[in-house]
Amino acid sequence: MNFAEEEPSKKYCIKGKHVAIICGVVVAVGLIVGLSVGLTRSCEQDTTPAPSQPPPEASTALPPQDQNVCPDSEDESGEWKNFRLPDFINPVHYDLEVKALMEEDRYTGIVTISVNLSKPTRDLWLHIRETKITKLPELRRPSGEQVPIRRCFEYKKQEYVVIQAAEDLAATSGDSVYRLTMEFKGWLNGSLVGFYKTTYMEDGQIRSIAATDHEPTDARKSFPCFDEPNKKSTYSISIIHPKEYSALSNMPEEKSEMVDDNWKKTTFVKSVPMSTYLVCFAVHRFTAIERKSRSGKPLKVYVQPNQKETAEYAANITQAVFDYFEDYFAMEYALPKLDKIAIPDFGTGAMENWGLVTYRETNLLYDPLLSASSNQQRVASVVAHELVHQWFGNTVTMDWWDDLWLNEGFASFFEFLGVNHAEKDWQMLSQVLLEDVFPVQEDDSLMSSHPVVVTVSTPAEITSVFDGISYSKGASILRMLQDWITPEKFQKGCQIYLKKFQFANAKTSDFWDSLQEASNLPVKEVMDTWTSQMGYPVVTVSGRQNITQKRFLLDSKADPSQPPSELGYTWNIPVRWADNDNSRITVYNRLDKGGITLNANLSGDAFLKINPDHIGFYRVNYEGGTWDWIAEALSSNHTRFSAADRSSFIDDAFALARAQLLNYKIALNLTMYLKSEEDFLPWERVISSVSYIISMFEDDRELYPMIETYFQGQVKPVADLLGWQDTGSHITKLLRASILGFACKMGDREALGNASQLFDSWLKGSASIPVNLRLLVYRYGMQNSGNEAAWNYTLEQYQKTSLAQEKEKLLYGLASVKDVKLLARYLEMLKDPNIIKTQDVFTVIRYISYNSYGKTMAWNWIQLNWDYLVSRFTINDRYLGRIVTIAEPFNTELQLWQMQSFFAKYPNAGAGAKPREQVLETVKNNIEWLNVNRQSIREWFASLP
């Protein structure tokens, strides 16, 4: 699975000056905002432009009514009270038939599950949620004899349906199986999980598509099943659908036949063994384009007929990366075909269903005339990510969700190798620093982080671990591991692992064993210290080559021994170091409590670079004199260090300063050379690193203008060099968008003037905006010169355009307006799926929170509408759980109190338990940070000539 893009590709965002002064009691804040939103809606609703064409209508159909065939029960007399399924009940095959009643927003189905029993029982239980059993289940012995059913009931606490037989069920042996048959029905609307329907426009007509999304625990919403990843089975799937539709599933079509004049039945080939979360089927009226892999496998991309051209790039990148992975893993793709399909409203970024990968449109469809280079890279990365899963995740699946990183960390790591193979000039092997390593090091330096391998025991806990630790930290430690044991032995170890556990389940220890076999190195001993405890170390260098380690935490007052770890927050660190152009690795044993000395041959003032290219998942702190030397070296000739090293210096220094391990004056000195910096990697990290300071001081009327003036000067030379013409290489276009966006953010008049001029020309219809400048022009043009007419025009363009990537940019532009009445109206539009798709609700809230005028409004809107959001998305929705992190920039005691009060009012956090911990910790740290650091930072900026 790939995350939806909750945040823009750039961490920094528009934050102008606040013009409102908060006054009055705290209680009044919520009331005022609530009233302003309501009054604005009632006064302004008539000015919202009508769609240029009738939008797809949201269904008002009700879910199927419970017929009480298997009524609810709180009976806890059996093992079904446990969260995990029992080991003695194991499915081996599903015969699944589903009928999609597209016009009625519902479906019916029948499933027969072949089950092995390793011990006698009278009770069978399996997962179900929301879907209803419509007929008493039927159970047959291996002989075919029917077993009388005493009763069935739903045990909703653990999302089970329990079937109790009237007779003993003996253990099975060999190929003998029990056959459990259940008829069921479900609702096709109401959410973006399970089997659901969404709509789109085609030539002015409303069209429908229905598809599944099952990871991690939503297959049980589509059909009754043993919904755990280690309950692998084969599947024979049939879909009955209106004759004008077609059907897809994991496997190729076996046959298609008319049931009657209106209905067609499509039957698919029996599958290989796979987990329930990978089962997929779709009912559609799309068209496909096709490529063939080098091994002869058909690779198809299904899209709306009028979007066919936008699927070409995805088809091409699929072919190139697919062939690369078949070679790299030395294992042919296991299924006869691989399809991809773009779903018009899709909750996550993409889902790796075996043989039928589903995508959000922004992550699959690319128009070279309308999409930005960043969009192209996003498509390539997500396609590669999902292709990795066809091996890591699908062929070999983690045994339980505590080892989710075996799926997601691996996909996040290998996606960069795959795209690097296909797009060799994109610097993808360095961009992993920007996308994964640096961001997750910030997350993992909080006390509220969690280990890579983490115990999960509820659906909410399972969905919550689909986070940066599983994805990005997983990728980061694999990058370090590959460097330590060498890429060749790492590749061999992956091949051993895939072959040994093909069509089966594995644990983290199994992967370590495979790599040890390939490398003859103590992989488990080293790597368990990185996966079984949270956090990471800072390596402190003294005397140029003596190093010690300790846990790195952003909160300098936190107890580094908490929560308790058997390893005591010490790590076995593969320390790469370079002297005189020679690079070596020394494994720093965690038991060396006094530190170690690197065997370097240093002469004169030679510099020993620890962690070159930030290859290891740790930070490095040098002595003050060494940091001064680095700053001087950057100013005199920054190219003596690689772009990755320059990024690493900056990221480490600002993180160390934030943790009070380094004076901010030293960190800020590293930015003095930036007038000479022309590379993408360092600038991206500078912008991200200083964004924290910018965010903390945006309301400081004395200090913020100093910050603006300084960074305007630092960015201007490269901004002038790049200009406003959309030309150059892929990397140059990414750099230009970042640099000009940062110049606008820092209030550069020339940059804002150019953005406004392009925006105004676009409003007048006299000129189009260059594709790679559109996002920043929509944002800063709207901020700088946007009014109600401009906002309405932008909304009209959002409703007219069919390209999802363009829609996303326009959503950000709408969120950048200064007019709070328009922002209030925008927030209320989130309740209308005819205007804002369900998939985009949390994206828009986040965009509004990046606007200084919308930050508090967005947070208060969430509080006022929490019951509505929970009702619409459920408390276990990971995106609802994470939306509270929009409060991370808050830095006052009042704001902290408001957050604590809100969380106390709604104590059931569901999938948001960990995000709540993280945002509270962050805001507390922000308050302390301001008290400690404002003076030294002010002195540094005030001392500038």
Curated annotation (Swiss-Prot):
The keyword Transmembrane helix applies. It comes from the Eukaryota. It is a single-pass type II membrane protein. InterPro entries: Aminopeptidase_N-like_N, Aminopeptidase_N-like_N_sf, ERAP1-like_C_dom, M1_APN-typ, Peptidase_M1, Peptidase_M1_aminopeptidases, Peptidase_M1_dom, Peptidase_M4/M1_CTD_sf. It catalyses: Release of N-terminal glutamate (and to a lesser extent aspartate) from a peptide. Pfam families: ERAP1_C, Peptidase_M1, Peptidase_M1_N. Its main location: membrane. The record marks 213 as: Binds calcium which modulates its enzyme activity. Keywords: Aminopeptidase, Calcium, Cell membrane, Disulfide bond, Glycoprotein, Hydrolase, Membrane, Metal-binding, Metalloprotease, Protease, Signal-anchor, Transmembrane, Transmembrane helix, Zinc. Zn(2+) binds at residues 385, 389, 408. The record marks 471 as: Transition state stabilizer. Residues 43-77 are annotated as: Disordered. Substrate binds at residues 215, 349-353, 878. Its EC number is 3.4.11.7. Substrate specificity is modulated by calcium which enhances the enzymatic activity for cleavage of acidic residues while reducing its activity with basic residues. Inhibited by aminopeptidase inhibitors amastatin and bestatin. Residues 40-945 are extracellular. Homodimer; disulfide-linked. Regulates central hypertension through its calcium-modulated preference to cleave N-terminal acidic residues from peptides such as angiotensin II. This is Glutamyl aminopeptidase.
